[in-house]
């Protein structure tokens, strides 16, 4: 969704300037946070309610030191406004598995992304009604000496959950954590990572630092 106020355009010497086209930064920020799932103060933030969530906008003009190399009369003499360094690579590690074909992506990153997407699905479809928006994933893949994939060695998942979940287990935090762990195995890991990739003694770490209950959030 693009939220803009009214705008005017000036055309001069084959150059177009847009004036007055100001994004509604506050609305965009609220919409993005709400789409992620932060719609309740109880779980960390209610982005939809101004009384409970304020959005501060700090948008300023470009640094004068950078601007002096950008705004030039001659297009040929204009410099870059900033520099960026990007790196990455394509590979065929994902292409041996039907669920991952077409990605041409490093296997650990591809599997981590699939886990993250699955965390959102189990929350939005109420498969795990106690799940909350804040979640993180990491996958460690073991390789043979020739560089071929041996299998998944470690899966790390952190998932925020309902603070009342322990009440289902007589207040036991240990039982609560084991329930979260088994649920992640059944509904996230085993339906996301191809079974042939999971090494027999792979390590699964769920909420490794302990309880991760409400409130969480950004």
Segment roles from a protein language model:
Residues 16-23, 210-218:
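Short glycine/threonine-rich loop-to-helix capping motif typified by GTGT followed
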Residues 34-38, 42-217:
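Glycine-rich, mobile lid/loop segments that gate access to catalytic sites or pores
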């Amino acid at each position: 969704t693009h939220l803009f106020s009214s705008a005017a355009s000036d055309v001069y010497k084959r150059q177009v300037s847009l004036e007055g086209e100001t994004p509604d930064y506050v609305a965009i920020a609220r919409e993005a946070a709400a789409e992620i799932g932060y719609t309740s103060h109880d779980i960390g933030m209610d982005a939809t309610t101004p009384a409970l969530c304020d959005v501060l906008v700090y948008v300023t003009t470009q640094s004068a030191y950078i601007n002096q190399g950008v705004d030039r009369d001659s297009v040929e003499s204009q410099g870059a406004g900033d520099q960026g360094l990007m790196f990455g690579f394509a590979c065929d590690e994902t292409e041996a598995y039907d669920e991952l074909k077409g990605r041409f992506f490093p296997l650990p990153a591809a599997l981590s992304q699939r886990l993250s997407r699955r965390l959102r699905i189990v929350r939005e479809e109420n498969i795990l009604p106690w799940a909350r928006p804040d979640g993180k994933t990491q996958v460690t893949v073991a390789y043979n000496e020739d560089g071929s994939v041996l299998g998944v060695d470690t899966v790390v998942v952190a998932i925020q959950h309902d603070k009342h979940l322990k009440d289902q287990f007589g207040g036991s935090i240990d039982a609560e954590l084991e329930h979260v762990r088994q649920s992640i195995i059944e509904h996230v890991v085993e339906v996301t990572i191809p079974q042939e990739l999971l090494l027999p003694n792979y390590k699964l770490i769920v909420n490794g630092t302990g309880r991760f209950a409400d409130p969480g959030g950004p």
